[in-house]
């Protein structure tokens, strides 16, 4: 009997690793949320013939017992990619332990890239715009020689090199030969981008400056969900939410900084009882949760089983754009920052446009501000389910109430919304941005605004507003909805607002 037990224990031990931890109490598991590792690796480990190998692009701290913590640069073996947002992965040779341990758990899929791929290189930033490349390189943490490589906006298959030189970002086209190879000038061709980078980190050879360190990746992506468990089951226990600090209040309820599961900072919108029908909200929220874009606030979860209803989203620490603009008043925010705000909002709205989704209440109060000058559109779709009461709200014969000063004339008349009525609202948002959060149609009631709009009145050009910026506003306020620009067009107009024809350095500079 004893020999049978010994053989049975030998068989079960690798599968019951947590039972054998008494052997070495000095071992500290860095991530308490990961699965406990075996005391000793099995003979077939690390099973490098199974799964795909990835590199972490950012740090991630486990949020639940099923998650896996890791740091940028760590190597991970992905075991299951069946869920879009969360993959099951194993940590290979966890740094700092020296024990070759392998820990297992779920990871956000947008935090990793396949090992030895271009996306895994710290200097590769993918399909970002030229303006975004400049903004990221100009962060104070970057020094002269900081650089990144991105996909070319105009030449498919080509790349662009962006370099910081004494506070100025310069761009170079990296061209590709049909037979393979990359070059700035044909006198020096490289078989891979890695060779290209290695060469120009040793010599400038015609560049404005020798390449030094890759641009810091400060803009960390938002996980699609709170955790793997809430990805599909997103009605969560309200006891898992702590309300820490009230950030603001309005006609619908309050907004709080909160903490989920004692691990994850979140924003919590607590709604006044009766402000919406829970069933209507859940139908809309199901769609809202599926909308994923870097410039949209991510809806994480809800608590609807009792009042007050909780809406849990990602946290943006600087509050609404309206308050952010009003508090600054022009002290630090100038035209270049204002155009950037508008471009980021247009980017998020262009995504909604591509998904045939209408916001219905686009305004500075519904744009939120995060770290590193990040702006995201919030509360998209909620106007359809809120029941509101305000003197500047127009109530149609269908008992739907509208924020008149931001609403397109045709939507006021017919109560029919479209992406083109959102474009009108975007024009009002541009007015808010350029005036540092002033109320549009100041001094007018909602009824007076309706009367003035019927006579083709438009907000006048603010004193500090450039003609180019005001022209974009007027395009948004075209009386014919079909004549208003798309958000895609508005996005590129604002992205290229300061651009000239000489945005790329001449490759003749490389010819000796």
UniProtKB/Swiss-Prot annotation:
Binding-site list for ATP: 247-255, 269
Localization in the cell = Cytoplasm; Nucleus
Q: Which InterPro entries does its entry note? A: Kinase-like_dom_sf (IPR011009), Non-receptor_tyrosine_kinases (IPR050198), Prot_kinase_dom (IPR000719), Protein_kinase_ATP_BS (IPR017441), Ser-Thr/Tyr_kinase_cat_dom (IPR001245), SH2 (IPR000980), SH2_dom_sf (IPR036860), SH2_Frk (IPR035805)
Enzyme Commission number, as recorded: 2.7.10.2
Q: In which tissues has expression of this protein been reported?
A: Expressed in intestinal tract, fetal and adult islets of Langerhans, kidney, liver and lung.
Catalytic activity, reaction form: L-tyrosyl-[protein] + ATP = O-phospho-L-tyrosyl-[protein] + ADP + H(+)
Stated name of the protein: Tyrosine-protein kinase FRK
User: Where are the Phosphothreonine residues found in this chain?
Assistant: 185
Q: Which GO terms describe its molecular function?
A: ATP binding; non-membrane spanning protein tyrosine kinase activity
Effects seen without this gene: Mice are viable and do not show any histological abnormalities in epithelial tissues or develop any pathological and/or metabolic disorders associated with the failure of epithelial organs.
What does the record give as the active site? 361
Q: Which residues form the SH3 domain?
A: 49-117
Q: Boundaries of each SH2 domain copy?
A: 123-215
SUPFAM superfamilies hit by this protein: Protein kinase-like (PK-like) (SSF56112), SH2 domain (SSF55550), SH3-domain (SSF50044)
Q: Identify one Pfam family in the record.
A: SH3_1
Taken from the UniProt entry, a GO cellular component term is: cytosol
On assembly, the entry states: Interacts (via the SH3-domain) with PTEN. Interacts with RB1.
Sorted UniProt keywords: ATP-binding, Cytoplasm, Kinase, Nucleotide-binding, Nucleus, Phosphoprotein, SH2 domain, SH3 domain, Transferase, Tumor suppressor, Tyrosine-protein kinase
Q: Which family does it belong to?
A: Belongs to the protein kinase superfamily. Tyr protein kinase family. SRC subfamily.
Where in this chain does the record put each Protein kinase domain? 241-498
> Which terms under GO biological process does the entry name?
cell differentiation; negative regulation of transcription by RNA polymerase II
